[in-house]
Amino acid sequence: MTWTHLPLGNKTSRFTQSALALMIAGTLPAYAGTFNPRFLEDVPGIDQHVDLSMYESNKAEHLPGKYRVSVVVNEKKMESRTLEFKAATEAQRAKMGESLVPCLSRVQLEDMGVRIDSFPALKMAPPEACVAFDDIIPQAASHFDFADQTLIMSFPQAAMKQTARGTVPESQWDEGVNALLVDYNFSGSNASYDAHDSETSYNSDSYYLNLRSGMNLGAWRLRNYSTWTRNDGNNTWDNIGTSLSRAIVPLKSQLTLGDTSTAGDIFDSVQMRGVQLTSDEEMLPDSQRGFAPVIRGIAKSNAEVTVEQNNYVIYRTFVQPGAFEINDLYPTSNSGDLTVTIKESDGSEQKFVQPFSSVALLQREGHLKYSLSAGEYRAGNYNSAEPKFGQLDAMYGLPYGFTVYGGAIFSDDYYSLAGGLGKNFGYIGAISIDVTQAKSKLANEENSEGQSYRFLYSKSFNSGTDFRLLGYKYSTSGYYTFQEATDVRSDADSSYSQYHKRSQIQGNVTQQLGAWGSVYFNVTQQDYWNDEGKQRSLNAGYNGRIGRVNYSVAYTWTKSPEWDESDRLLSFSMSIPLGRVWSNYHLTTDQHGRTNQQLGVSGTALEDHNLNYSVQEGYGSNGVGNSGSVNLDYQGGVGSASLGYNYNRDGQQVNYGLRGGVIAHSEGITLSQPLGESMAIISAPGARGAHVINNGGVEVDWMGNAVVPYLTPYRETEVSLRSDSLNNQVDLDTASVNVVPTRGAIVRARFDTRVGYRVLMNLTQANGKAVPFGATATLLDTTKESSSIVGEDGQLYISGMPEKGALQVNWGKDQAQQCRVAFTLPEQQDNTGVVMANAVCR
């Protein structure tokens, strides 16, 4: 029940007195012991017989009913929820000094962390029935802070489950609603080239569509990942994979059927089609969880960056001149080299390979992380055999900071066994060492046997130095990974038969320099048997700030055996804030002394800052000449759109993109920004146009729905609407809802809205007198709940009112202290959307 106390207009001091009295009466229980109704005796127009007992004491007469309250359990804040409160018994009043006590069921107490099994009376109680928890659990108590609408619960520690920090009870995990969904990302470009030093001229068109579609049915998630590419009239459609998955909560695991990839902690990850059961560490609280690649590079001009893995294009974006960073990849497997192509505006390309494998993490004592996979190897776009195989990976935390791990791969023509040991050495860092023995049957029935040795080290120092990964791996000439051996069997002339991996080293170091900024250093090297060359790359940079001016210096060096010379690029960037606009300067130079400079502005626009724009103008040496670009990126409630134009001496290009999602569910079809893995559908009937907090551009649509994307699975997330964005005929009982989605879930965040008119009504009795101050008025409507309190001179402000209806008015328990108002609202409104009305209470 919602009580609304609002001043009703500019009145005399007589009205001010009564309004002040009402506010004191409504708030007094939070601060004082009693409220004396004699305070109102000298206020003209107040019926001295009105029943104001509900305001007389903070220990007494708040009305029983349902209230939306914040919940605090043993000083830990939990999610807000609607709870029923009952009038306290005399024994409860004496014990806790409370007028209202919460009506809590066994299930609700368990959600709060109470150890139900320790109390037979709780264990035997019906799941949804109110229980006398304060009698059953010694020293248990509750306090309802009515003014703050907060329920404070206190239980002895022995009565509580021993849970890790950050634990969200499994009973709150929400599998979501049944729905169909599509997450799409489309990009295109149209270019025309007219080389200044030749007679060559041509047009080039390129399009790319990334689709992640699926269906949720209960706990099951059906997903398909497909891409479409069109380059200069040549179409390619790739069905990358289809899978059916669900959470296995008792095992803290994820079951997947169909296309997936094996774990990459011990062996190199490969794509497969079959069945997999793997630990899901997202189900663990943050305090018990113990590497996604970041790609850095430098673009000399407005460039297109493409990332491929396993011969699939998994990412494409357009970047401006200078150093760039890509940190939001979704690789198709947990390891596998990433091929990065930077296509400059003049058509030239830079290419480098970034080795990628996930870090073998140490496990907490007693924690088992595992993965079981069985099925058929998938070669992706490569022409290779697809043998059946099984793989097991396991890591277990031992005492004293040790972790033991191992695994096995079995196939008709291949087997591999691995074992290793990791140790957390505290100040020294974390180290792991493992060895893998493999035997392969290659082409022409040739057998090959060998070993691979791996060393990993990671450490963060108090000085701000962070070794995220320092690793070395060496393989003997007879060692083949499962993927290498399979490809060699498929093609005796494969490069793997002569050139397979020999050693690999990679390191990532970041050093924080406090007020002086930070530096980073990334290096990788990879070489192959029977090949003298080495594949190497180095990235280094410095980020700093002087006053409000940000600047950075970056250097990249890449070398591949098939290249005659290495690629070297040096860049400098500087940004100066000018309100909501930034002035930017970029400079890049390569090993041949060719220099490119760009000067421009960028910023955001619109109320939610959801329109990004940039304008750049540049000049290149060595005859490159002038260049420039204009880019817009809009993030709307139903999707995102981008548009860009750039030119140089050899031509011009227009690029554009659309990103978003569509969800079909029981309450409509809702368009969205890109969806991510887990998401929430807001349901707020009648609240069209309401803005979602912390989600720029997202608004409730005409059906009362909106999508909040990119929720973290198994983590509590608060979804909130901006009250000031509601129209004049909508009120919310609460402006925020907490949700806890499981992996891939589409959860419902339901807001209770009161849709109707805001009314300022002058109420008189049949005898012509005003309805007494302090009387309660309740809407008689089975579909709506709206109540308020009558002010001085019979003035009533109430929201959520229909055009026609009836109000029940009470100011006491006698029949003479009750009446009913039948009303039909007039059309006139003031400038705040409030309807003015007069009515007789009979």
Curated annotation (Swiss-Prot):
Classification via SUPFAM superfamilies: FimD N-terminal domain-like (SSF141729)
InterPro entries xrefs: Fimb_usher, Fimbrial_membr_usher_CS, FimD_plug_dom, PapC-like_C, PapC-like_C_sf, PapC_N, PapC_N_sf
Keyword Metal-binding: no
Membrane topology (UniProt): Multi-pass membrane protein
A cellular component annotation (GO) from this entry: cell outer membrane
Residues making up the signal peptide according to the UniProt record: 1-21
Keywords (A to Z) from UniProt: Cell outer membrane, Disulfide bond, Fimbrium biogenesis, Membrane, Signal, Transmembrane, Transmembrane beta strand, Transport
Main location: membrane
GO MF, one example: fimbrial usher porin activity
Disulfide bonds, paired cysteine numbers: 819-841
Top-rank taxon, per record: Bacteria
Gene Ontology BP terms: pilus assembly
Subcellular location: Cell outer membrane
Stated role: Involved in the export and assembly of LpfA fimbrial subunits across the outer membrane.
PANTHER family: FIMBRIAL USHER DOMAIN-CONTAINING PROTEIN YDET-RELATED, OUTER MEMBRANE USHER PROTEIN
Family: Belongs to the fimbrial export usher family.
Protein name: Outer membrane usher protein LpfC
Organism listed in the record: Salmonella typhimurium (strain LT2 / SGSC1412 / ATCC 700720)
Gene transcribed to yield this protein: lpfC
